[in-house]
Amino acid sequence: AINVQTWQLKLAKQFSPNYVRIVQGMLCLAFDRAIILGLAKKNPARMIGNIKSKKVKIDFWTLEEFQKVIALLYKGDYYEHYLFISFWLLFMTGMRIGEAAALQWDDIDFETGMLIISKTLYYKTMNDYKFVEPKTQASNRTIYIDADTIKELQEWKAVQAKVLPNCGFVLSYNSTPTSKTTLPRALEKLANLAGVHRIKIHALRHSHASLLISMGENPLLIQERLGPEKIQTTLGTSGHL
């Protein structure tokens, strides 16, 4: 048990408490299995216990902060319109950036307001990318999009079609899918201009969860909408609400 505790303390100096807890849990299960197989008599990992979890503060924007940012984008400019719809879609759906980059017009039913999420995009370069199936079945989901989002998407589709008549990607301004650096850089620049705190692109997903929680939505339904995500993470985005 002493050796395991020494290992645990050493690990805690290098990694986050939550990561150490995961590794410790796996070690504990391994010892349990060893006991069943007759390879060990005791479980030292269970004897010393796990370290305390650390609540991670998750960053997000409120609706008001998001509106300040997108208000800086002029939809009369083709590229700015592309940025507008990209950030709008991420904030209003909670999609991961890879899921949004892989989204195609055929995945959206404007009549029913349903959006199908069935793939993600692995992007290496402009000419080297591929669709990847989600790691879990829960990532395959169909979500409802609100009337304003439908309107914004239809407007962007019409504008995009004039420049790129045969483009299948929703978030594209040049016939290729959105790169993994374009949106994060633009988001950081716009945040500075808008005078709001900077967030990572993934935080728009957390912002969507925060918005739904503030509207009184059921946390379990929010989790289903976001796909595989710990419910504690979903709730943690808006612990102040």
Listing of model-derived features with the role each one plays in the protein:
Residues 1-39, 55, 76-81, 177-182, ...:
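N-terminal core-binding DNA-recognition domain of tyrosine site-specific recombinases/integrases
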Residues 14-17, 71-83, 93, 143, ...:
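Short, basic (Lys/Arg/His-rich) helix/loop patches that form interaction surfaces
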Residues 17, 21, 36-103, 111, ...:
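Basic, Lys/Arg- and aromatic-enriched nucleic-acid-binding interface segment
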Residues 60, 121, 226-241:
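Catalytic-site neighborhood detector that most strongly recognizes the C-terminal catalytic loop/helix
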Residues 98, 111-149, 159-163:
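Basic, Lys/Arg-rich DNA-contacting stretches centered on the C-terminal catalytic core
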